[in-house]
Amino acid sequence: MAVGKNKRLTKGGKKGAKKKIVDPFSKKDWYDVKAPAMFNIRNIGKTLVSRTQGTRIASDGLKGRVFEVSLADLQNDEVAFRKFKLISEDVQGKNCLTNFHGMDLTRDKMCSMVKKWQTMIEAHVDVKTTDGYLLRLFCVGFTKKRTNQIRKTSYAQHQQVRQIRKKMMEIMTREVQTNDLKEVVNKLIPDSVGKDIEKACQSIYPLHDVYVRKVKMLKKPKFELGKLMELHGEGGGSSAAKPSGDDTGAKVDRADGYEPPIQETV
């Protein structure tokens, strides 16, 4: 072994001695998460992010965050099996402005619907809204006994399943194709699409538990601040839904240099 100085000893002091413990939360800030105006409860919670430091800007860390919220919390309701995904698209002051990003049913609800002695029918379709959002909708329905039926099972024939699936796809395409994202979300909240499918398929085979079980966001148009502000009731138009109830969030401040979109008709 070569003779020389031991570098560890000459540095002095114990290894890792007196390391200053810094609380990580002292460098972070809380931001309010705001839901769009389609929902009754606007203030859905808070999120944490590191403060702006050098080139790392806090608002960039918040954009793109996805929040999963139960519809019961958004509507102050008891029906809690539907979950909505909201994505943070812009930051105004201490508020994160979110937009619709997807919908899902809870696992326990899906499991409770699947039973013996009935046929499960599923369908999915890719549809584009009038304002350029490409959505993938998944639908599920189950056959039920006819009135005065004695037989235990209620299985649909393969031809009937195909007819019902075709009807599901037609109704989902029609409901989304002719509306913008805001109107589509307004239909997903009470699940009027599922009720329409159930009514339309009665002549083929009686159904129950028909739901749009999942909505995926596949493609979005280019981000426009004006449209997002309209969703949050700041567009200046009367079309923005006004939230009701005492638990509604405060109005969001306008961005610096924000101008409302020019209206075609007055």
Curated annotation (Swiss-Prot):
Q: Does the keyword Zinc-finger apply?
A: no
Q: Where is the composition biased (Basic and acidic residues)?
A: 244-257
- Example of a GO cellular component annotation carried by this entry: nucleolus
Top-level taxon: Eukaryota
Gene Ontology BP terms: ribosomal small subunit biogenesis; translation
Q: Which GO terms describe its molecular function?
A: structural constituent of ribosome
Q: Where in the cell is it found?
A: Cytoplasm; Nucleus; Nucleus, Nucleolus
Keywords associated with the record: Cytoplasm, Nucleus, Ribonucleoprotein, Ribosomal protein
Coiled coil feature spans: none
Tell me the segments the record calls region Disordered: 233-266
* Primary localization: cytoplasm
Q: Which Pfam families match?
A: Ribosomal_S3Ae (PF01015)
Protein role: Component of the small ribosomal subunit. The ribosome is a large ribonucleoprotein complex responsible for the synthesis of proteins in the cell. Part of the small subunit (SSU) processome, first precursor of the small eukaryotic ribosomal subunit. During the assembly of the SSU processome in the nucleolus, many ribosome biogenesis factors, an RNA chaperone and ribosomal proteins associate with the nascent pre-rRNA and work in concert to generate RNA folding, modifications, rearrangements and cleavage as well as targeted degradation of pre-ribosomal RNA by the RNA exosome.
UniProt family annotation: Belongs to the eukaryotic ribosomal protein eS1 family.
Identification of the protein by name: Small ribosomal subunit protein eS1
Please tell me the species this chain comes from: Salmo salar (Atlantic salmon)
Encoding gene (name) = rps3a
